[in-house]
Amino acid sequence: MYPQRTQHQQRLTELLDAIKTEFDYASNEASSFKKVQEDYDSKYQQQAAEMQQIRQTVYDLELAHRKIKEAYEEEILRLKNELDTRDRQMKNGFQQQQQQQQQQQQQQQQQQQQIVAPPAAPPAPPTPVTSLSVIDKSQYIVNPTQRANHVKEIPPFLQDLDIAKANPEFKKQHLEYYVLYNPAFSKDLDIDMVHSLDHSSVVCCVRFSRDGKFIATGCNKTTQVFNVTTGELVAKLIDESSNENKDDNTTASGDLYIRSVCFSPDGKLLATGAEDKLIRIWDLSTKRIIKILRGHEQDIYSLDFFPDGDRLVSGSGDRSVRIWDLRTSQCSLTLSIEDGVTTVAVSPDGKLIAAGSLDRTVRVWDSTTGFLVERLDSGNENGNGHEDSVYSVAFSNNGEQIASGSLDRTVKLWHLEGKSDKKSTCEVTYIGHKDFVLSVCCTPDNEYILSGSKDRGVIFWDQASGNPLLMLQGHRNSVISVAVSLNSKGTEGIFATGSGDCKARIWKWTKK
């Protein structure tokens, strides 16, 4: 009996030894794997540091290049302005010389008449000037040969916006707004306010639905949808979870401004972009969020749906434009540029996307391939591109042109050639605003361009000629956003404005 127990003990000892051997082997192997992993981690960190260094070097080079380019452009602009000033001085000197010669001739003629002619009756008192018939209309009209020029004089009726000083013939005054008309043209357009919509904070954006029945507005933490006809509030959209999630997406001030809103083509969905880097897709029938698109690393400033309704384009301060597939909620294409993106737009046929940025440039890409089709900037052949950040872009209804508004106080109209061997050109530069241009849009008939500015005004421009037809002063603060209803017709239309005075307003224009 005892010998058998001894055999069991020996067997147990052998098994324990085998287990110990296996454990030692596994421990050695684990140590080996750990060492390999540490080597891999070390190499990864080293390569990541090298990549970060390379990226920083590239950013530094881009910054240096941009500064050098800006310095050259500023010097060129200074020289151009100096030449323009010199030309104007020479022209004024020549005109003064001519006037002096004419005065001398008139004095000589009067002296001769006094010698040979009998005394004349005393001169009649001067007739006060109240009509434009004796005013030089050329000061109010853009010279056709200078349509695209970046440097032009502001028409006199836009230089002083004091309604009390305006000619009664060329103004319309209301308790809450007034309109100044260009005296060189007949008052064919009339502007009336339809609704004034109060908000609790600055109105950052306004946008009509495709059928023109509804308008969406974005302000602090809230998106609202109104009936255009009645002005009734039909939806108030607030993401309550944004107040609960105090993570990296929360702004330091606790504010969450809705920077952009856009209806889907069928009007069933509303996309909103905000400071927390998120794009929210709302179902308007339930007033609930059905998708959240994540990927941007900074504030989202602009959104636009594609005509098919399955894709959405976004622009962000993180220097990227992204195209989203709403069927998968994934980003299908990312387009990176040198500076923050402030505005995006999709062409009517969905084939092109345009973006404006802080680097004073409008870029146009093929929406399918991501190929850069056009770069519209101050470096074009004629040197008549924008000279400051571009804050708004809009395609014309036929998709052949792009309007852009900039902090350089101008609006520009670009003709898209769509050919690799021929560059797109700036057709018209619209001069008249006295401060930053923050928003632009085109009427569906391509007859007018509307622009909103920090000078609190909205200007109606004749798209083809570049002439300012009228200025609407309808807010007490900057006009941050302007939008036109797509169902506007040639003789009448609806547009909306959003302002820093915490109001969104719906307006109607009629053409006589």
Swiss-Prot record:
<dbReference type="GO" id="GO:0042304">
    <property type="term" value="P:regulation of fatty acid biosynthetic process"/>
</dbReference>
<dbReference type="Pfam" id="PF08581">
    <property type="entry name" value="Tup_N"/>
</dbReference>
<dbReference type="InterPro" id="IPR019775">
    <property type="entry name" value="WD40_repeat_CS"/>
</dbReference>
<dbReference type="GO" id="GO:0000209">
    <property type="term" value="P:protein polyubiquitination"/>
</dbReference>
<dbReference type="GO" id="GO:0017053">
    <property type="term" value="C:transcription repressor complex"/>
</dbReference>
<feature type="repeat" description="WD 6">
    <location>
        <begin position="432"/>
        <end position="471"/>
    </location>
</feature>
<dbReference type="GO" id="GO:2000879">
    <property type="term" value="P:negative regulation of dipeptide transport"/>
</dbReference>
<dbReference type="GO" id="GO:0036171">
    <property type="term" value="P:filamentous growth of a population of unicellular organisms in response to chemical stimulus"/>
</dbReference>
<dbReference type="GO" id="GO:0030682">
    <property type="term" value="P:symbiont-mediated perturbation of host defenses"/>
</dbReference>
<feature type="region of interest" description="Disordered">
    <location>
        <begin position="90"/>
        <end position="130"/>
    </location>
</feature>
<dbReference type="GO" id="GO:0060258">
    <property type="term" value="P:negative regulation of filamentous growth"/>
</dbReference>
<keyword id="KW-0853">WD repeat</keyword>
<feature type="repeat" description="WD 2">
    <location>
        <begin position="253"/>
        <end position="294"/>
    </location>
</feature>
<dbReference type="GO" id="GO:0071280">
    <property type="term" value="P:cellular response to copper ion"/>
</dbReference>
<dbReference type="GO" id="GO:0036180">
    <property type="term" value="P:filamentous growth of a population of unicellular organisms in response to biotic stimulus"/>
</dbReference>
<keyword id="KW-0678">Repressor</keyword>
<dbReference type="GO" id="GO:0019005">
    <property type="term" value="C:SCF ubiquitin ligase complex"/>
</dbReference>
<dbReference type="InterPro" id="IPR015943">
    <property type="entry name" value="WD40/YVTN_repeat-like_dom_sf"/>
</dbReference>
<dbReference type="GO" id="GO:0044182">
    <property type="term" value="P:filamentous growth of a population of unicellular organisms"/>
</dbReference>
<comment type="function">
    <text>Represses transcription by RNA polymerase II. Represses genes responsible for initiating filamentous growth such as HWP1, RBT1, RBT2, RBT4, RBT5, RBT7 and WAP1; and this repression is lifted under inducing environmental conditions. Also represses genes which participate in pathogenesis. Crucial component of the response to farnesol. Plays an important role in the regulation of white-opaque switching.</text>
</comment>
<dbReference type="GO" id="GO:0000278">
    <property type="term" value="P:mitotic cell cycle"/>
</dbReference>
<keyword id="KW-0805">Transcription regulation</keyword>
<dbReference type="GO" id="GO:0006972">
    <property type="term" value="P:hyperosmotic response"/>
</dbReference>
<dbReference type="GO" id="GO:0097308">
    <property type="term" value="P:cellular response to farnesol"/>
</dbReference>
<dbReference type="GO" id="GO:0042393">
    <property type="term" value="F:histone binding"/>
</dbReference>
<dbReference type="GO" id="GO:0006974">
    <property type="term" value="P:DNA damage response"/>
</dbReference>
<dbReference type="GO" id="GO:0044114">
    <property type="term" value="P:development of symbiont in host"/>
</dbReference>
<dbReference type="InterPro" id="IPR036322">
    <property type="entry name" value="WD40_repeat_dom_sf"/>
</dbReference>
<dbReference type="GO" id="GO:0098609">
    <property type="term" value="P:cell-cell adhesion"/>
</dbReference>
<dbReference type="GO" id="GO:0001217">
    <property type="term" value="F:DNA-binding transcription repressor activity"/>
</dbReference>
<dbReference type="GO" id="GO:0009372">
    <property type="term" value="P:quorum sensing"/>
</dbReference>
<keyword id="KW-0677">Repeat</keyword>
<dbReference type="GO" id="GO:0045892">
    <property type="term" value="P:negative regulation of DNA-templated transcription"/>
</dbReference>
<dbReference type="GO" id="GO:1990756">
    <property type="term" value="F:ubiquitin-like ligase-substrate adaptor activity"/>
</dbReference>
<feature type="repeat" description="WD 7">
    <location>
        <begin position="474"/>
        <end position="511"/>
    </location>
</feature>
<feature type="repeat" description="WD 5">
    <location>
        <begin position="385"/>
        <end position="424"/>
    </location>
</feature>
<dbReference type="InterPro" id="IPR020472">
    <property type="entry name" value="G-protein_beta_WD-40_rep"/>
</dbReference>
<protein>
    <recommendedName>
        <fullName>Transcriptional repressor TUP1</fullName>
    </recommendedName>
</protein>
<dbReference type="GO" id="GO:0042826">
    <property type="term" value="F:histone deacetylase binding"/>
</dbReference>
<feature type="compositionally biased region" description="Pro residues">
    <location>
        <begin position="119"/>
        <end position="128"/>
    </location>
</feature>
<dbReference type="GO" id="GO:0036033">
    <property type="term" value="F:mediator complex binding"/>
</dbReference>
<dbReference type="GO" id="GO:0044409">
    <property type="term" value="P:symbiont entry into host"/>
</dbReference>
